[in-house]
Amino acid sequence: MGAPPGYRPSAWVHLLHQLPRADFQLRPVPSGFAPRDQEYQQALLLVAALAGLGLGLSLIFIAVYLIRFCCCRPPEPPGAKSPPPGGGCVTWSCIAALLVGCAGIGIGFYGNSETSDGVSQLSSALQHANHTLSTIDDLVLETVERLGEAVRTELTTLEEVLSERVELVAATRGARRQAEAAAQHLQGLAFWQGVSLSPVQVAEDVTFVEEYRWLAYVLLLLLVLLVCLFTLLGLAKQSKWLVVVMTAMSLLVLVLSWGSMGLEAATAVGLSDFCSNPDTYVLNLTQEETGISSDILNYYFLCNQAVSNPFQQRLTLSQRALASIHSQLQGLEREASPQFPAAQKPLLSLEETLNVTERSFHQLVALLHCRSLHKDYGSALRGLCEDALEGLLFLMLFSLLSAGALATTLCSLPRAWALFPPSDDYDDTDDDDPFNPQESKRFVQWQSSI
């Protein structure tokens, strides 16, 4: 199938699409996008479950490390006041992990923004497509009503005025038949009229979900940022109660990070399957929801020379009918105006109606061409399969970095907490500790003595 203009599946789409998939029985599952298929749903759930496995391994590692730290720690010599050496190394490792987490937060904000931009582009494309479809329906309705009004009023009046000339009455009735035929042909061009599926409603639903997704990620990013900052503050002030609280919060955020990573991974894999061949799924789904013929849908979704315009015959017949009406009105104006002055007014009104109808017809021809709607289709795919997918990958990187940083922090904080001096004995803190308050006090005293 022909790709929409400007859209080509990216390298990330190909890479994620080629990853193996399996159901709960570990049987291979095809990578074609089939969200209603139970085996495909199980494959995506299994991808999300890998994050749960990562969370379990992280918790086991942290538990084993802390148990070893508590049970295998050598006893302190009697009367020892200074903490064991290496406190600075423990503190610096915790600081490094927190700085990595802060870098991941920046990546997360960028990914969240990219995903939001992609969804916004999808929503804008759907709204523009809805505007095009609504304009087609409105133009067809107005044109058909205008021709019907001309048949009921001007042509009827003209027949009454020209009743004395049989050949002129015949020409008038011929124009009536052509107007009715043109209206009938034009009425079949409103292919979206009466369809329950509304692109603007889909756009509103997508925007509604995206707003809550964006807000949820902003809150998660801010929560991770606050945990990192307050943990650094607790290390700087050597506040035991703050470190204990941040340890509990780090455990909570660790669970949230792995959970968000599972959702992101499953969504990215499913989105890559859709983006590798979107035409087939979108065409089948649209035909199922709207009941529109496959010829029309193929014309707009593919828009290439291999697919003919399904409206070409109706457009040709309508154009011929309008040209015939125009020719007959010109003949009536030449023959009837000198002999029947009363025919001048309906003829002028008919001529004006015909000119407006021809302008609307040419506008319809432009709107019915596949270029406009196919361009919207390509824009929607680029927003979803390029910006949104790229944003999801950055969010996955954020989740991975924050999970690793928080796991390291959870291993380091209890050791750092154990190295904190009692509140009444700050003079015995480790000289290697970068947050040693006595070192800061000595530095201030040295400056004042200069």
Swiss-Prot record:
Family matches, as CDD domains: Tweety_N (cd07912)
InterPro entries per UniProt: Tweety (IPR006990)
Disulfide bonds: C275-C385, C303-C370
Record GO biological process: cell morphogenesis; cell-cell adhesion; cell-substrate adhesion; chloride transport; filopodium assembly; gene expression; L-glutamate transmembrane transport; mitotic cell cycle
Superkingdom: Eukaryota
Extracellular side: 1-43, 110-214, 262-390
Topological domains annotated Cytoplasmic: 65-88, 236-240, 412-450
Positions annotated with a glycan in the UniProt record: N130, N284, N355
Region: Disordered, residue numbers: 428-450
GO cellular component: chloride channel complex; filopodium membrane; filopodium tip; membrane; plasma membrane; smooth endoplasmic reticulum membrane; synapse
Keywords: Cell adhesion, Cell membrane, Chloride, Chloride channel, Disulfide bond, Glycoprotein, Ion channel, Ion transport, Membrane, Phosphoprotein, Transmembrane, Transmembrane helix, Transport
Entry's localization field: Cell membrane
Keyword Phosphoprotein: yes
GO molecular function annotation: calcium ion binding; intracellularly calcium-gated chloride channel activity; volume-sensitive chloride channel activity
Function summary: Calcium-independent, swelling-dependent volume-regulated anion channel (VRAC-swell) which plays a pivotal role in the process of regulatory volume decrease (RVD) in the brain through the efflux of anions like chloride and organic osmolytes like glutamate.
PANTHER family found in the cross-reference section: PROTEIN TWEETY HOMOLOG 1, TWEETY-RELATED
Subunit-structure text: Homotetramer; disulfide-linked. Homodimer.
Family: Belongs to the tweety family.
Protein name: Protein tweety homolog 1
Protein encoded by which gene: Ttyh1
